[in-house]
Amino acid sequence: ACIGAPLLIEELKKRGFKKGICIVGEPTNMKIIDAHKGCYEYTTYFEGLAGHGSAPHKGVNAVEYAARFIDKLLKIRKILKDKTPKNSIFNPPYTTLQIGGISGGIARNVIADRCRVDWELRPVIKEDGVFVNNEIDKFVNEELLPEMKKTYPKSSIRKEIIGEIIGFDREEKSEACELISNITGDNSREVVSFGTEAGLFQEIGISTVVCGPGSVSYTHLRAHETREDR
C-alpha cells in the first residue's frame, strides 16, 4: 500500500521541496475531503507442529493459537471503542479493527502446523495504532509463543506489515481545499474512513486535499464505474 508515495516524498525532501499543493485523486464524488483515518494492514503467520488429530497434545496447533490471537484482537477492539475521542469527526468515531481472513490446516484429522490471519485497523489517532501493536505483541511474546515453544521450540509467530498509512488531519486553513473550492464552487468539507497518501504529503508541510470523480462505494468491485459528467 502506498509504495510510490514514500519514494516521492523522499525525493521531494532531497530537492528541498517544502511548499505547494497536493491533490490526491480518489473517488469522492468531487466532494472536498480534508481528513481521514489511518489504515494499518497486517498478516500474522503462525507455525507450529503437525501431527495426527488423535494426539493433539503431541503437536502445536497453529489454527488454535491463531484463534486465541483473534480473540485478543476482538477484546482490544472493545477497548478502542471505549476510548472514542471526544468530538471525533469520523463515522464511526472510534478506531476500527477487523479480521479480514484466516486460513490454515489441511484436514480435520491433522493437527494444523500453519495458519495465517489477515487483519487491519484504522486509527483515529496515531496513538491508537501504537496501543494496538503494543498490546497484541505483548500477548504474543508473553503468552502464546512461550506456550507453543514448550511443546515445539521451533514454533513461531511472525507479523508482516502490509502497509501503514498515516492519518490525514483537518486543518483550519488549507490552500489546497480553497483551490478546489474555487474550481468546483463547493465550500463544504467532509471526512472519510478510507486511507490515502494525503497524510504523507501533509506531514512534510504540503497543503493537501483528497478529491476526485466516482464513488468509493464502487471501489474494489468488478463493476467499478463513474458518471460521464464527473
Each PLM stretch: what is its role?
Residues 1-41:
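Acidic/histidine-rich catalytic neighborhood of metal-dependent amide-processing enzymes
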